[in-house]
Amino acid sequence: MANRNLEKLASIDAHLRLLVPGKVSEDDKLIEYDALLLDKFLDILQDLHGEDLKETVQECYELSAEYEGKRDPKKLEELGSVLTSLDPGDSIVIAKAFSHMLNLANLAEEVQIAYRRRIKLKKGDFADEAHATTESDMEETLKKLVYKLNKSPEEVFDALKNQTVDLVLTAHPTQSVRRSLLQKHGRIRNCLAQLYAKDITPDDKQELDEALHREIQAAFRTDEIRRTQPTPQDEMRAGMSYFHETIWKGVPKFLRRVDTALKNIGINERVPYNAPLIQFSSWMGGDRDGNPRVTPEVTRDVCLLARMMAANMYFSQIEDLMFEMSMWRCTDELRVRAEELFRTARRDVKHYIEFWKQVPPTEPYRVILGDVRDKLYNTRERARHLLAHDISDIPEEAVYTNVEQFLEPLELCYRSLCACGDRVIADGSLLDFLRQVSTFGLSLVKLDIRQESDRHTDVLDAITQHLEIGSYREWSEEKRQEWLLAELSGKRPLFGSDLPKTEEIKDVLDTFNVLAELPSDCFGAYIISMATSPSDVLAVELLQRECHVKQPLRVVPLFEKLADLEAAPAAMARLFSIDWYKNRINGKQEVMIGYSDSGKDAGRFSAAWQLYKAQEELKNVAKEFGVKLVMFHGRGGTVGRGGGPTHLAILSQPPDTIQGSLRVTVQGEVIEQSFGEEHLCFRTLQRFCAATLEHGMNPPISPRPEWRELMDQMAVVATEQYRSIVFKEPRFVEYFRLATPELEYGRMNIGSRPSKRKPSGGIESLRAIPWIFAWTQTRFHLPVWLGFGAAFKQAIQKDSKNLQMLQEMYKTWPFFRVTIDLVEMVFAKGDPGIAALNDKLLVSEDLWPFGESLRANYEETKDYLLKIAGHKDLLEGDPYLKQRLKLRDSYITTLNVCQAYTLKRTRDPNYHVTLRPHISKEYAEPSKPADELIHLNPTSEYAPGLEDTLILTMKGIAAGMQNTG
């Protein structure tokens, strides 16, 4: 198969070169990388499980490839009969093999992207394949602003050092790959990149070959399935591991590159170390919306754990800095401090490895940094004690309690070096360290708290009932506001210890008590989901005051559903009209807009347009009241939940809605894609910072009035069609549950939170992630495209000139272009033939016409999209992506078919299959089948092996689509 596979891959490559000769360069290594990994893997498979199993994998691959060529449904049935005849152990091995091959294809692709980028930069070209604007590189962006758009270098520098990008890592349950495997994947990537380095010796090559073999085999031999559900603390540790592995060192490295880019446009200053260019926040252990497992104790643990990790990372670096700071020339200010510290230093020196004796005053910088090291040690140990025992005997004065205390001695060293003519030394590791302290502080990340507005209403209702002044829940909005403002303006406490509390009320109040107990720099924003009115915001302000939160968190309303987005500007105007609130916010307000629930509620088309309009209107309201507005974008990883390339998403936002301040969620599997490797981390930071700068200094065009009018009309049609099918069609939920693996999603143990807000109920109560996940698995992607076709059809039928208008919008308006391109990309990943197979096997016959009409709608929508984009074929403007998707099609199809038939076997007790004798030989005992794999899941309610096979197909398809939910 390896040779045949290489031929097939090469033919895809040749076909692409013919299509667009200028676009696919001859130095493209993707085919080579992919074939090498596949070769290695197939050899391993044969060694471990025998020739017969390897041949079955090849047979499945070839049937898939034949299907991909002609889309002949008979080939899927042939493939199905091969897969259903396998015994349970073989079935697991084959599903695992295809899932593994898709992960290897992803790794080949990542190494190729990094390789191509290096080649481009060496040539001095723009870094991206098609055109510069799709990849925001810092240096390119600065040069473009200065040389093409005639901005002055000083103006650009000024904008840059005042901008902030805050990346908020969330534990959304979409990372379907286990951490054990992610680490092995990282090592495979490194081996592959080094194997193709120019100056590699034969011995190096042999050793790397062995290492690659070892890591591929180790990954294949690791159980891909999480056998228990992760806790919020597990999720937080997984999220924080990226800081340890890439982000910690990535930030100073990125800021150095910004310094270099500034030098190249004539600015001879560095970005100040305290410029808030990049910030990190987290929802892991703070997001309790619909997740009962995030308790106040979890929030406290997560904050202390992050503080301990931060102190530990600083501590592990401080000795290197002490080695570097061996200079003796210093300012009088620093010398006096060093002598004072030397005199008063306690003699009970810690058991340090380096500088374990007292440092002499002739090395003043080391004396100062030695004191910093002692305090960091104590800071780490105190956090550890509090985490383990709730109490610590290390006094507060021996630790750093705020970041200013930590920065002060470091700034003293920096000033002294500069004053003594050693700026070049100051701008080395010390500057990097200062930048890390400014970025990560003592808490590593700022934890956001998220809670549903109803939970606050419950607490206030309990309080008003206890005070015997009525039921807060039943009061009108006016009465609620009046009472809240009266209490906020007064001084008296609202309730005492005698307040009767249910578990839920105690949970909410205890969360506020944790906010009061821990240092304020642990926390970021308090986000209220399902916020609709000013009283929702005032309620949180009052509860913070009542629970004695010394530095109250900024309160951020989250608008998600279509109706809430429409009402958001009016709600914010009412809030800004309240004098007490206007004084409280000091001219700054953050508003969060949710992409996933708005898409689930109204479909992607209407959600995208409403999000665009809501931002424009919110910006105008804020301007009217003299408030600086920060938009917080709650984007998922998939297009159905607002995902897509970062730089394009930023550059297509309405003009003046970012203005140098951007907050955005980085969710689930996107964290790995953004920060899994050093070069990915670097690229992510570049993209966000460069695109934010460009959006502010070179805003996209505003849509013309006639475009707006057309969009408004189309949005009505799109919403109507989407809702008429998803919410009004009486048997839609039944069809959805039969045609997709939605009901089986929970078995993957991806995240700590339940997949439903309420245990029973229809689409409304289903979370957006499993909703998208289920459709992604069947490659039908219904939530992404449903409504687009009807909207375009109606617009063009109403007036044929609208087609030209839509084509013009596509060419000149970034928002519209990005929206269409993302849906086109999803169509390129889709295959209605797979959805048809699922219908045939899993859906009751009387619902088949419903599936057929949806597939007809799919084809019609695709045709309209191509017409508007002016393309003959999907992705003709992006040959690289086309090539990458083609490479993985045959693997995914095998898993799709395996999933459909496995679902049939788990759901239909009357479906009988004839199993052939087992073909897999276990390496240690060739006579023994691979049935020990079945014993990894002893509690399955299905026939042996079926549940694991099913979960492996879900994980493999998620890896292949590169989108989970």
UniProtKB/Swiss-Prot annotation:
InterPro entries: PEP_COase, PEP_COase_bac/pln-type, PEP_COase_Lys_AS, PEPCASE_His_AS, Pyrv/PenolPyrv_kinase-like_dom
Phosphoserine: residues bearing it: S11
Pfam family membership, one: PEPcase
Residue positions of the active site: H172, K600, R641
Entry binding sites for D-glucose 6-phosphate: W283, R450, D597, R635, T665, R753, R767, A768, I769
Catalytic activity: oxaloacetate + phosphate = phosphoenolpyruvate + hydrogencarbonate
Cofactor (UniProt): Mg(2+)
Residues engaged in binding L-aspartate: R641, Q673, K829, R888, N963
Cross-referenced HAMAP family: PEPcase_type1
Biological role stated in the UniProt entry: Through the carboxylation of phosphoenolpyruvate (PEP) it forms oxaloacetate, a four-carbon dicarboxylic acid source for the tricarboxylic acid cycle. May be involved in phloem loading with sucrose and in anions and cations uptake and amino acid biosynthesis in roots.
Entry similarity comment: Belongs to the PEPCase type 1 family.
Protein name: Phosphoenolpyruvate carboxylase 1
Source organism phylogeny: Eukaryota, Viridiplantae, Streptophyta, Embryophyta, Tracheophyta
